[in-house]
């Protein structure tokens, strides 16, 4: 039986790491033990090198389109070499970010051309998409305060507040239009967030159980 692909999305400081643990806990309760973890950008040797280029300052400015193309290069390496093979083996994959991140950050935050964004997505990924996307919604002010509390910010995390407001607005549009996505209020206590995530996964499981 083919596995399923669950993705966790959200702004910086939304609590994706904790959400990851909540999803895995539910899967284990459902007797799904063979779970593969991924992160974007990253997850393969080449993708991890691209991650470093994307997230850190370089000797020359990185254009918005170059940034996006590096993200897609890393993504297809991960999808073709890790995610798809795992799914075909019946394993479940839980991912920290996927394509919705690019649509929100580069499409919303960077304000790249929507037609260019859609064409690139369809060319690289085709009809491949997560079975379930869990979006952790948080006010950028709250999220960035949490992120700063963790230490030094990377190149993208250092963007101005307007960038993150645009990114969040695009996330909200994407989730609204995606029947396979659920939104969780990430400004609640960690206990309430975890409970909402576990409930969302269980409800999704029941509605898709065959």
Curated annotation (Swiss-Prot):
This protein's record includes keyword rRNA-binding: no
Pfam families in alphabetical order: Thymidylate_kin
A GO cellular-component term linked to this record: cytosol
Catalytic activities: dTMP + ATP = dTDP + ADP
GO molecular function, one term: ATP binding
UniProt xrefs under CDD domains: TMPK (cd01672)
EC number: 2.7.4.9
Regions crossing the membrane: none
Keyword Manganese: no
Highest taxon of the lineage: Bacteria
UniProt-annotated binding residues for ATP: 10-17
InterPro entries per UniProt: P-loop_NTPase, Thymidylate_kin-like_dom, Thymidylate_kin_CS, Thymidylate_kinase
Entry keywords, A to Z: ATP-binding, Kinase, Nucleotide biosynthesis, Nucleotide-binding, Transferase
UniProt record, GO biological process: dTDP biosynthetic process; dTTP biosynthetic process; dUDP biosynthetic process
NCBIfam families hit by this protein: DTMP_kinase
Function of the molecule: Phosphorylation of dTMP to form dTDP in both de novo and salvage pathways of dTTP synthesis.
Family membership: Belongs to the thymidylate kinase family.
Protein name: Thymidylate kinase
């Amino acid at each position: 039986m083919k596995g399923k692909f669950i993705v966790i999305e959200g702004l910086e400081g939304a609590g994706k790491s904790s959400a990851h643990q909540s999803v895995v806990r539910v899967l284990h309760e459902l007797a799904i033990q063979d779970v593969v973890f991924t992160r974007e950008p990253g997850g393969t040797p080449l993708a991890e090198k691209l991650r470093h280029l994307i997230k850190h300052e370089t000797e020359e400015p990185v254009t918005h389109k170059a940034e996006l193309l590096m993200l897609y290069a890393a993504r297809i390496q991960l999808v073709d070499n890790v995610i798809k093979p795992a799914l075909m083996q019946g394993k479940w994959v839980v991912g920290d970010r996927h394509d919705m991140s690019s649509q929100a950050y580069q499409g919303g935050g960077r304000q790249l051309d929507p037609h260019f964004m859609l064409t690139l997505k369809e060319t690289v990924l085709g009809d491949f998409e997560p079975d379930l996307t869990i979006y952790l919604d948080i006010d950028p002010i709250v999220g960035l305060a949490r992120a700063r509390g963790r230490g030094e910010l990377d190149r993208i995390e250092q963007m101005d507040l307007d960038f993150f407001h645009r990114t969040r607005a695009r996330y909200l549009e994407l989730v609204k239009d995606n029947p396979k996505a659920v939104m969780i209020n990430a400004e609640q206590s960690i206990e309430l967030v975890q409970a909402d995530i576990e409930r969302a996964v269980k409800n999704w499981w029941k509605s898709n159980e065959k």
